[in-house]
A protein has these predicted regions:
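An exposed tryptophan-centered "aromatic clamp" motif
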Residues: 71, 76-92, 98-148, 159
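Extracellular adhesion/carbohydrate-recognition regions
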Residues: 2-93, 165-171, 178-191
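Generic hydrophobic/packing signal
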Residues: 48, 60-63, 96, 102-103, ...
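Solvent-exposed, polar surface segments
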Residues: 10, 137, 141-183
Length: 192
């Protein structure tokens, strides 16, 4: 067998082909190392806390509650409704910033949205929600637009506030002792 035939055989043999091609996601190189992956704790009350960002998230989103998409104004009303009800005992629920929404996202995490598509948020969040969230950030030069964050791609985008095909995942700031397990507090006591 000639060298050319041998090269052809090697190149066309499926056992010799590298079938572990890597999928490169847009923006994936910007996300950094594994230590930046969100670390979530299920609080057992319909909320999840991210110990890295000190944010508390509602486990489900507006789609799980209503069954349809909402516009930015309805997302604001949704936060207000949760605050009036004192959901999980708190009255300071709000839309996240773009950076806060991004902090819940990681390519190493996997969940599914309402259509069964993969989203990159912790499996501790309820599956079957929307694939994006409104943020509180308004476009500076054109206030009829607000920022959305995609949990599929990790991208931020500007969307008209009247767009009803978006969803809302709410958050709040937490002080560490609000959700820190009792056993952890005890282990932090040092004697001299």
């Amino acid at each position: 067998m000639s060298d050319e035939q041998e090269d052809f055989e090697e190149a066309s043999d499926p056992d010799l082909l590298d079938d572990e091609g890597e999928t490169e996601w847009v923006g994936e190189e910007e996300w950094g190392d594994e230590e930046e992956v969100p670390t979530f704790v299920d609080n057992g009350d319909g909320t999840i806390s991210d110990t890295r960002s000190n944010l508390m998230w509602k486990k489900d989103d507006s789609f799980k509650e209503f069954g349809y998409g909402i516009n930015w104004f309805e997302a604001q009303d949704y936060c207000e409704m949760l605050n009036e009800k004192k959901f999980a005992g708190y009255d300071d629920w709000r839309l996240p910033s773009g950076e806060e929404a991004k902090s819940a996202f990681s390519f190493t995490q996997s969940n599914s949205d309402k259509d069964g598509a993969e989203t990159h948020i912790s499996e501790l969040f309820e599956p079957g929600g929307g694939h994006n969230t409104w943020t509180y950030e308004e476009k500076p030069d054109y206030q009829q637009y607000a920022q959305k964050f995609s949990f599929v791609t990790g991208n931020e985008m500007w969307e008209h506030k009247d767009n009803e095909y978006s969803y809302c995942r709410v958050t709040r700031d937490v002080i560490q002792e609000e959700w820190e397990p009792e056993w952890r507090k005890e282990t932090k006591t040092f004697e001299r």
